[in-house]
């Protein structure tokens, strides 16, 4: 670019860093920064980096309750109280999120598709997960911190979930669960 008299004052490399959702091997932030710094050495260029997803993804967990278990000839389903409106990434992008029981159950496992209660074929949070679970169990859907809440919606008139901050032994509600009344507050009936 310099040979064509194009002088850059800054470069925005975007996010760049991947997140280990399953078995991916993204570069460590230090490796990534060094690779970029080595290419820019000696140049008077401001580097802009947006690491939001790499910072937030593994900082968030969506906790959901198993409401029902059902099976057909081919599949076992765990119907949970969370849905695609709460975490759209698995449905929208086929994103893989680790799903683990909050409490370990010493029982035989089965392979389940974890699905929500919305009447859509795309309402799934995970497919083919080997779990030992029963109705009433809590599941943790890991790596839900990046874009979880910002991409959530009120689809099917479902209030958005609460956000809870856990800091050591301290627990803080940082965003309350929406209510049905809050969903209606901006609406009016025709005269």
Show which residues each predicted segment covers:
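Short, hydrophobic/aliphatic alpha-helical segments
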Residues: 2-5, 134-136
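Conserved N-terminal phosphate-binding loop of PLP-dependent enzymes in the Aspartate aminotransferase
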Residues: 28
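Alpha-helix-loop-beta-strand connector modules within alpha/beta enzyme cores
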Residues: 1-4, 32-43
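Glycine-rich beta-strand-to-loop/alpha-helix junction loops that act as flexible
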Residues: 11-18, 51-53
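Charged (often Lys/Glu-rich) extended helix/loop segments that serve as interaction or gating elements
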Residues: 35, 44-191
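Flexible, glycine/charged-enriched surface loops at secondary-structure junctions
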Residues: 3-10, 46-51
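Catalytic palm subdomain of template-directed nucleic-acid polymerases
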Residues: 18-24
């Amino acid at each position: 670019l310099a040979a064509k008299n194009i002088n850059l004052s800054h470069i925005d490399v975007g996010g760049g860093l991947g997140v280990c959702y399953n078995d991916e091997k993204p570069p460590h932030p230090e490796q990534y920064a060094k690779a970029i710094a080595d290419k820019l050495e000696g140049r008077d260029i401001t580097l802009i980096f947006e690491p939001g997803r790499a910072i937030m993804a593994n900082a968030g967990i969506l906790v959901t309750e198993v409401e029902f278990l059902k099976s057909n000839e081919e599949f076992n389903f765990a119907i949970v109280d969370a849905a695609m409106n709460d975490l759209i990434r698995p449905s929208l992008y086929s994103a893989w999120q680790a799903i683990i029981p909050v409490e370990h159950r010493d029982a035989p496992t089965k392979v389940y598709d974890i699905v929500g209660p919305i009447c859509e074929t795309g309402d799934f949070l995970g497919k083919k997960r080997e779990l030992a679970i029963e109705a009433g169990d809590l599941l943790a859907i890991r790596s839900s911190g990046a874009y979880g809440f910002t991409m959530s919606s009120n689809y099917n008139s479902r209030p958005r979930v609460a956000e809870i901050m856990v800091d050591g032994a301290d627990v803080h509600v940082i965003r309350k669960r929406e209510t049905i009344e809050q969903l209606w507050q901006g609406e009016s009936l025709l005269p």
